[in-house]
Amino acid sequence: MDEDSATIQLGDRRLGNAVDHDLLPGPPGVDEKSGNENCEPRSSGSGKRGKSNSRRRSTSRGRSDSRNTSPSNTRRRHSLSRSLTPPRRRYDSPDYGRYSRRRFDRDRRRSPERRRSPPRRGRRYGRSRSRSMSPRRGGRWSPKKKPSSPPVPPPHGGPHPQMTPGYGAMAAHIYGSYVAPPDVYGHQYGIPPNSFPPQGPGYGIPGAPPDQSSFGSGYGPPPTSAWDVNVYGQQVWINQPISGVQPSASDSLIQPQKARETLSGKTIGEEQSVPALEGAGLTPQDAVAQEAEKQKDELKKQRANYVKKVSLLKKEMKVLKDQREDLAAGDAPPSPTTKNFIEENDRLQMQIKKKLDTIENVIDMLNGIIGYEEVEDEPSNQKSHGKTQPEQQDSRSHSSSESSADSSESSSSSSTASDSSSDNEDGEGAGGAVGSPTNRLKHRAIKSMKSKQLHGEMKAVPTQAQNYNFVFFDPEQHWCESCGVFPKSARDYLKHLHAEEHMNRETIETPWHVGIDHDPFPTFENAPARRVPVRGMQFLVPANAWFCKLCSVWIGDLHCASAHLKSRLHSNKYQQFLNQNPNYEIEWQTNRERAMNQQKDHDDAKNKKSKKDEDKASKKRKKKGGDKKKKKRKHGKKSKRSTIDANSTSSSSDSSSSEEENGQQPKKGRTEQQPICQSDKSTNAASIRVAMRKQESTPTNLKPEVPCQPVVPPPPPIIKDSTIPSERGKWTAASVEDQSKDQKNRDDTMLKQWNNVQPVISESEKKLLEQLKGRLKNKGARDQNNHKAVPTEANDEKFRRGGGRHSRSRSKRRSYSRSISRGRDRDRRDRERDRDRGRRRRSRSRGRHFSRSPIRSSRRSRSRQGRSRRSRSRSIERVERPVVKHSEFRPRTVPERKQTDIKRDKKDAESKSKSSKPSNNSLPGGKKLPFIGKMPVFKKQSVPSFNYDASAVYTNGCLEAPPPPPPPLGGATSQIAVRQQAPTAAQIQMAMMEDAFGNAPPFHPDAGMMVDYDELMPDPVQFANLMTSCPPPPPPGEGSEGDAHGPEDGDQHDNENREDVLPPGIDEAESALVPHPLDAAAQSRDGELPKDLVEALDIIFPSDVAILEASNGNSEKQEDVTITTIVEDDAVLSVIHLQDLAKEGIHLVTINEAEVPKKSHIQTSEKIEKLQDLNGKSDDGVNIKLIDAEDIPMPNSPPAEPSFDEETKSKALQKQADISEIPEPAVSPSDSEKLRRQSELDELAMLGIDRSDMAAQYAL
């Protein structure tokens, strides 16, 4: 056994000598490695067995060998190694050696060679490489671990057990005392990192091992005791009794060194096995742990820096992203500059992203080296880096030993070192090792591991809860409590805070004034004052800022506001506020909803109120406007009707009726008309108008009873359109009882009349109507200027609607005493008559139609307008109209008149006179009825009124009176009309033909003339009656004269004025009124209205007596006036038979008319136009002034009647003489008649009668 150990020692020595010779010239660092290699040649030669043997022997022999080694050699080599080790540390330091070697093992063994070898090392690595495979694993650790000198322990390892028993204590004492100093010295240097201990064995092996081997081989026991003997005399002999065991007493000073040496020897081959470390002491492990910790600290620092860089880069990335969102915000496309900014932003983001990727990779590598446990020590780094992995932490904590083994055998983690050290302590049982630094490190490592595990477990949950990327959004639930505004978005809310509405609120908040530190300069009591300018103003920048009350932070713009609201500071502050006030959000939300609901209700209420107010205001305006339009305007059809109705109601009632009643009465009239006429609504307006026109145009006046009859349900609808419904209402109010009595008879008569009327209308009449329309339209401009109304509209209304309206107004005026049905029938008949007469007049005086048609049309339109305008002052109009027409047309009306027209006129005059004693009020109603025949008359009326009888005009009160005459004429004219009812149909047709050609009067015989004037005369008769009735009773006398005069003057004046005014107006009105309605009305109305018919017949036929009786009986009424006038006319004509006289009168008129066109139609037309213009001007100017004076007293004064009677009689006689002289055109000189007519018109104008009213009366 001893020999074997000796041989081993000798071999070791040789290896050591050879190595020493080679290493001495080289650098010490290389020598150490060579020494390591010398320590390992055995292992290399013996292979892995040698390594195992060295491990076995290291425990016992290592210690004795380290002591037996010559102190001088070890000291010298330690000293040399000291100076030379730093470079080896530099290259073999843990930075390069340990981890590089580990990396080299991982990374194909390149890095360690590069790092280890300057060129010298590279040269000598030839042997070292060949010798040491093991050093490659732990070779870099060898310099630190060589203090245990692995070569020395193996040789002693074998013989050590042999030497202890063989050689006793002597050898041990000798070498033990000698060897002790190097051990102490080596231990001193071993305390710093293991540099010195490894060097000692490297250099001490060659000298000492031979001695040790020789002595060890001879003296086994001494080496064991040698550990106890020291050069310094430290308890050398105390350890001797423990020859086979390591003395514990000496371990207090020496054991640390031994442990380091043994561990260093094991760490040289630390790869060999952990049990080697377990058997070794803890001191070498302390050095390893310290170095590992240092390296880890450095790596931790590096990783912390990288983590900080990552956090900064991420912040920059967020800023860039926010900026890009702001740049890209908005619907409008970005501008070129904005695009450039966006591109630059994208480029920067890409760069930062690349940097982040690289840095994160480096951090991953460091985590793999250091372990993720270290990350837990830096939670801030974890959060910033975002790579907290609790699972990995747990796995690391549990598998710390595995990770350390994987990283490197030498660079095992502190936990592994602590575990191994604890095992070694347990195995060795060294009590003194508890207070060693290794123990302390071990305990620290264990505690840190346990604490880390606990912290990892504790932090696992909160870290998981924080693993979210917060994305903020706008809840769009904003509310400015002070202003009561609900902005839609956060941006709108921030803008609202700067709006005037918010800035001008009553309460203003200034939280920034609280706790603000202005940092003013201190003030000293006795110090002098020094003036200093305020500087730095140029650095102030304006900003629409906001102040966060929670955070006490100023925010300069929207970008900063967005950043602040999304910041952790603001979120934390708000969370703290919520923690203090947990119900704040709920309360705020409920208050917001409540305020929103209140605001909505308030807004709705305001809107409703405003709408209601607007509606009310609009309704009031409409009502007022409607009332005003009804009273003043006549543009709209409805407004015209309403105004006519209102006017008719006020006029039909006492003249003192108020305007309010006018506004309401039309409605009442309409409502009353509805029950009266049940089928009115059912019938269409068009059919009603057509039927009414046909009935009016038809000579079927045999049934004039219908107008007198109350409302007939089937016809009334037609009448309603043709005749004004307001009239019905008035009639109903005045004569509802009569309507109820005669309603059945009226229905039958109305139906019969309509049936007869429709076929009566001929195509020639229709043509004439169309011609009249065209002429009126063409010549309407003049009339518009004079009457301020469109002639075309007047014509259209006349034929379509106007006739009905005017007739309605007339019938209203008449309706007071009449039944509704009577007014309707009369209106219809008046329309037909007026149209036919206008046509005939125009046809007769085609040569003069230029003057007639325009004048008539203008007068008609004027009369219509004047009627509506003058409805209030109807008394004046009525007086004026009958006067004018009475004087002109009385002779013709007496000879022949349509029954229907006469009856209508009679009834109208009677009803109006009854309803309103003042003839002026009743006249307006009469205006509309006689207007049909009067239109042409009034056109001529300007001149003819003067020509015929100025006195008659005056007596009648006004030229306007002729239109109203229909009501007064109704009685008288009806009587006259009764006479000539039979011939009216044929005669009317003849008259239409004659009028169309204009030559009818001269060519036709008396009968023919009678026929012509039957249609033409009914209006004159009505006018004559009205003229007489409308003025006071005196007008009839003058009316007769006017009548006598009328035919002559009418013819002449018509000739002068182209006979449009006088002959057509006189002839048509009078003839239509006298012949037709008298017969039919008297016959048919005997049952219904016997009084009216009888009175009319008596007044007409008996001449003066009947007229006087009628005038006396009806002096209060207008009918008396009309009757007296007609009677006077009849009396004047009674010298000859009434019929003959009428016929002759008609002949005279027709002859005059015929002669005039033959002589000079153009001249007469021109003269008439001139006279009409003059008359119109004079009328317009004078009528207003003289209306009250002359019109009112004239109709109302009965004493004037006799004067008029005388005048009318004289005029009638003159007219009779003139009638005989009619064939001679010179009988009525145009000039004298014109002068007369002009004077009459002037007087009428003075009375306040407008030519327009006259024209309207005649037109309709």
UniProtKB/Swiss-Prot annotation:
The record's Gene Ontology biological-process terms are: negative regulation of DNA-templated transcription; positive regulation of DNA-templated transcription
Task: List the biased-composition ranges (Basic residues).
Answer: 48-60, 117-130, 137-147, 618-641, 801-816, 838-873
Q: Which UniProt keywords apply?
A: Coiled coil, Metal-binding, Nucleus, Phosphoprotein, Zinc, Zinc-finger
The keyword Ubl conjugation belongs to this UniProt entry's keyword annotation: no
Where in this protein does the record say Phosphoserine is found?
335, 697, 1197, 1228, 1232
Localization in the cell: Nucleus
Q: From the Swiss-Prot or TrEMBL record, what is one GO molecular function term?
A: zinc ion binding
Q: Which residues form a coiled coil?
A: 285-366
TM helices/strands, residue ranges? none
Q: Residue ranges of the Matrin-type zinc fingers?
A: 546-576
Q: Where is the composition biased (Polar residues)?
A: 381-392, 672-686, 752-761
Compositionally biased intervals (Pro residues):
148-158
Q: Which GO terms describe its cellular component?
A: nucleoplasm
**Phosphothreonine is carried by which residues?**
338, 700
Provide the protein name: Zinc finger matrin-type protein CG9776
